[in-house]
Structure formats: structure tokens, C-alpha cells
């Protein structure tokens, strides 16, 4: 039996096409993936992300534990509510998961992990927490709704109470704050402004309906994927996994190398990979007809005249740009052009930074 989120019936009311997503019954779309995509780029859309797992880490050693567990450094978080993104690595520097961590107090951090990796993550976190004075608490009674797009904040403000709006007024990107029963965060997976709202399951249906009443368009996994790919955001299991290190997944910026005496899990392996050199994740753009897809091979000739090969990790048609885009893992020596093999022939592509659309506009 697939898991169902607390919003399952609301999806059916909006005529969602439901699919299995890592053991969860989730909406693929509500009729038109393209319309849902454009709603987020041009107005406001919302996603049920209640399949994500909220984990609270509390105790006197919470900071020390997370500084060991994560490649990014939570000690950088000084202002309550500030969040950071980063990888949780194994001893070989493989990515167990990518996650967001919120600093709430010196003894209270909130971590949001992916649904596909939940059991693995929880087991790893529990194992690594031994010897630290911390309590790790999964919060299954909490649902999550992401409201994204240029008009998302205004439409959400019409739903929040006066006290909630006052609490989050002027909140910068990548912050989260408890406001009444809602934990409201200025994070997202679309490249647009908006909120990710953690809400008690008992209130989730009412919040979803209130947002619907404000004209926020429900959006499914299909649009979520094209939006995140346009924004150059990784999807765990496609763009990286335990066989990939963060340097090869465009996550180098999330590694806190300083201070050098912080011995986070995977550090030694990662330093060796850094010194030896790794593949890298790049963006590909193909302006002629056709769609770049996961697993298609990528070819280029390096400066020494040697043919090199990589692979597409994620590819799609970009509704915002009107042509196909992809992320590909390739040898470091790639230039600004390459070829992709599709339908038994090679097609020329441009190589760009893996960030295609930001705030509705072309980003490369």
C-alpha cells in the first residue's frame, strides 16, 4: 500500500492524476503540467510536499553533532531561523542525502530530508548521534505545503493571520520562523520567491483550501521537476546519490572547508577527491527540436584532441525557454560546446552553468 499524505483527498477534488513516488501516492499533475509550470513562473502555484521528512535535533550537543554530520557548517548560522543547504556524506564522501537545516536555538535545529531517503537517513542520523547529547525526533504529524511564484507571498499573506504576517515581515531568503501553528520558511525548489510552510496535519486541508480560494494553482510532480531543473537544482537519485561526491554534483559551494579542524564525516575522502580532481555537473542547452533525457551520452573533444564522454543526469523540455535543457556529469576539461547522442545521431549542444532560469528570466 502506498503512503498517502493528509492532502490526498484535496488532490482528488482537483482532479489530480496520481502516481507512485517512492512509495507515496502523489499528484503528477492536475490536468496540465505546462500550465502549472507557467503559473509558478508568472503567478503562484503550490505543491504538497508532505512526503518530505521533518526531523528535529535538540540537546546540548546539537550544534557539535550537526557539525560532524554535515559537510556544510551549522556554526555559520548565528541568527535564529537562518537555514543552510548541504550534503550529508558517508565516509567515502558519497552523498547520502541533500537537506536543509534551520538554526532555531543553540540547542534546537530542524532538518528537512527527502522522502526517497527517509529510512536510510534516519538510520544514519541515529547511528552517528551515538556519543552526543542529542535527541533526534521525526515529526510525522507535520505536513508541508510549498507556495511559489512572483505572487506567492502576497497570496499567502491573505491566508496568514495578522500575527503571522507580522512575525514574518521582512524575512530574508533561506529563513524559517514559527508563527502560530505554522513554521513558515523562505525556501523553495523552483527558483522563484515564496514559502515552504510546515503545518500540523490537522490544519493542512484548511490551509490548502484557503490558498486555493486565493487563486493559488495546485501543481504536481511534473511541474516540480521542470521548475527545479530550470533553476539548476539537483534531484536526489538522478543528479547525485551515494556513488557521487558533492564536488561532482555542483555542490562544492555547500562544503565548509574552514575551519580545517572540523572533522565532518567524509572530509578525508573529499579532500583527496578535491586534490585529485573530479568530474563536474554542467548545464546543457539544445535549441533545435528534441528533448534531452536522463542517461543520454555526452561527447566532447578536450584541448589535447582526445574525445571525452559524460552523461546526462536530468533533462527536459523547458517551458519557460521553449527548448530542451539538461544537467550532465562530464570530465572537468569540457569547453562551451559538446554533442549529445540521441536517436543514433549526435546533436550539438551549448555548455552553460547549471542554472537556466531565475525569477522567470533566462539566467545564462
UniProtKB/Swiss-Prot annotation:
Single Gene Ontology BP annotation: glycine decarboxylation via glycine cleavage system
Enzyme class (EC, first level): transferase
The UniProt record lists the keyword Protein biosynthesis: no
InterPro entries reported for this sequence: GCS_T, GCS_T_bac, GCST_C, GCV_T_N, GcvT/YgfZ/DmdA, GcvT/YgfZ_C, TrmE/GcvT_dom1
Keywords: Aminotransferase, Transferase
Function field: The glycine cleavage system catalyzes the degradation of glycine.
The family this protein is said to belong to: Belongs to the GcvT family.
Identification of the protein by name: Aminomethyltransferase
Native source organism of the sequence: Shewanella sp. (strain ANA-3)
Encoding gene, per UniProt annotation: gcvT
Amino acid at each position: 500500500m502506498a503512503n498517502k499524505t493528509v492532502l490526498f483527498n484535496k488532490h482528488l477534488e482537483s482532479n489530480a492524476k496520481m502516481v507512485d513516488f517512492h512509495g507515496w501516492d502523489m499528484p503528477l499533475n492536475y490536468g496540465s503540467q505546462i500550465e502549472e509550470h507557467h503559473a509558478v513562473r508568472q503567478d503562484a502555484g503550490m505543491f504538497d510536499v508532505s512526503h518530505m521528512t521533518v526531523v528535529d535535533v535538540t540537546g546540548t550537543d546539537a550544534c557539535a553533532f550537526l557539525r560532524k554530520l554535515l559537510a556544510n557548517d551549522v556554526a555559520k548560522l548565528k541568527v535564529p531561523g537562518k537555514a543552510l543547504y548541504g550534503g550529508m556524506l558517508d565516509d567515502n564522501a558519497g552523498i547520502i542525502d541533500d537537506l536543509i537545516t534551520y538554526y532555531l536555538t543553540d540547542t534546537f535545529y530542524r532538518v528537512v530530508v527527502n522522502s526517497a531517503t527517509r529510512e536510510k537517513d534516519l538510520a544514519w542520523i541515529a547511528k552517528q548521534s551515538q556519543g552526543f547529547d542529542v535527541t533526534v525526533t521525526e515529526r510525522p504529524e507535520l505536513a508541508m505545503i510549498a507556495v511559489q511564484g512572483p505572487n506567492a507571498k502576497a497570496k499567502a499573506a491573505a491566508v496568514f493571520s495578522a500575527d503571522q504576517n507580522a512575525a514574518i515581515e521582512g524575512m530574508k531568503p533561506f529563513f524559517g520562523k514559527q508563527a502560530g501553528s505554522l513554521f513558515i520558511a523562505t525556501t523553495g525548489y523552483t527558483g522563484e520567491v515564496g514559502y515552504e510552510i510546515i503545518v500540523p496535519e490537522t490544519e493542512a486541508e484548511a490551509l490548502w483550501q484557503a490558498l486555493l480560494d486565493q487563486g493559488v494553482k495546485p501543481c504536481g510532480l511534473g511541474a516540480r521537476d521542470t521548475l527545479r531543473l530550470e533553476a539548476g537544482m539537483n534531484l536526489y537519485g538522478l543528479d547525485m546519490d551515494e556513488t557521487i561526491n558533492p564536488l561532482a554534483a555542483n555542490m562544492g559551494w555547500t562544503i565548509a572547508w574552514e575551519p580545517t579542524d572540523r572533522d565532518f564525516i567524509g572530509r578525508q575522502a573529499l579532500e583527496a577527491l578535491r586534490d585529485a580532481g573530479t568530474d563536474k555537473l554542467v548545464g546543457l542547452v539544445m535549441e533545435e527540436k528534441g528533448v534531452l533525457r536522463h542517461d543520454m551520452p555526452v561527447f566532447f573533444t578536450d584541448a589535447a584532441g582526445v574525445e571525452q564522454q559524460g552523461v546526462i543526469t536530468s533533462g527536459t523540455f523547458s517551458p519557460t525557454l521553449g527548448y530542451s535543457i539538461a544537467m550532465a556529469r562530464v570530465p572537468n576539461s569540457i569547453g562551451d560546446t559538446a554533442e549529445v547522442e540521441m536517436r543514433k545521431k549526435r546533436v550539438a549542444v551549448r555548455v552553460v552553468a547549471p542554472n537556466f532560469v531565475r525569477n522567470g528570466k533566462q539566467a545564462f
